[in-house]
Amino acid sequence: MKPAYPPLLLQMSPAYTPRPLKNLFTANQCWAHLLEEGGLRDIEVETVTKMLACGTSILGVKHYTCGNHSCPHVKYLCNTCHCRACPSCGKKATDQWITVQNNRLPDCPWQHLVFTLPDTLWPLFFYNRWLLDALFRLAADNLIYAAKRRGLRVGIFGALHTYGRRLNWHPHVHLSVTAGGLDEQGVWKNLSFHKEALRRRWMWLVRDYLLGQPLSQLTMPPPLAHILCESDWRRLILAAGGQHWHIHLSKKTKNGRKTVNYLGRYLKKPPISGSRLAHYTNGATLRFTYLDHRTQAYQQETLSQADMLFRVVQHIPEKHFRMIRYFGFLANRVCGQYLPKVYEALKMATPGPTPKLYFAPMAKAFLNVDPFRCVLCGARMVYTAAISGLTVQGLNLNAQAIAQMRYVKP
């Protein structure tokens, strides 16, 4: 079936070089071959197809004409995909999230924590991704419980990461918590956490949660294929990890900006940056460098192009899964009630609304060129029409054709 492209046809130009991540997928038609083989999740196909079509007329086009009626200049701007796996769209989403958080977070000491799982349980969460949803709640409950015992309400925001530095499957939870909280009288009091107590309770909470899941509802990964009955399941969970349930507590910081900037770099973008793929020359294999946290030395790993693609797409979250969540007085349900009290207790001015980021100011700041200024006469470009692009259903139907377009230029 021929792809049903929008009215504005694509111009194919061998002089155009796609971004490194797009090039990784389209070189040697590797992604197209993987689509033919099948076995990919629906969300992986949908997200990658959106990313490959981003910035082309496939997603639709906005038509601008010069405000000076005697000027013939016309400009077309192609729509973007707004998906998390896109390195282009991730920049705006990242900056917007960081701006919002830095504006509203209380100006007080914060502490960053990382909750990890034993590697024997990693495959279980890979084959049963719905289990990931509870990790947020279990990790946050650990901190809320410790604060509640002291009569305090803390603020927490967190993110789920599913990848390690080698892009392998390694689910873990990042949480940032205020190093203090509100008591019942609305007074702010400092708070510290005991690492070993947190570790033991984290281990108990995860084990208790997993033991509560019916074995019939779980998909057992190949390494755990021998688990056939409830007693085997219970034995596995109670023995998993031994003492290798780790929690990392960073040093307290004077505010939450450092953590916000750190998490923002990873949450709205692909798991690997384009700069780490810039050296890729369309070969059958590629080599990438990563920092080994055990040896604190840089290591190199060589992978086939297909293996690298599998490592990237496995970290695409399921549809509607929220990778960032808020708890305590930052929870969406109660933040309107408690944040004003927190600002008052910390003697902070109530922050105003966060300015929204738009394409034109960002482009002007980066390129030093106003995208809506006519290049011929200097007048303002005026929006006049739009050409609709493919819907999500249309993108999925044309995924194979889009994957085969190596060089795409609108």
Curated annotation (Swiss-Prot):
The keyword DNA-binding applies. It holds the Pfam family Y2_Tnp. GO terms for biological process: DNA transposition. Keywords: DNA recombination, DNA-binding, Transposable element, Transposition. One of its GO terms (molecular function) is transposase activity. Involved in the transposition of the insertion sequence. PANTHER family: ISSOD25 TRANSPOSASE TNPA_ISSOD25, TRANSPOSASE. This is Transposase for insertion sequence element IS801.
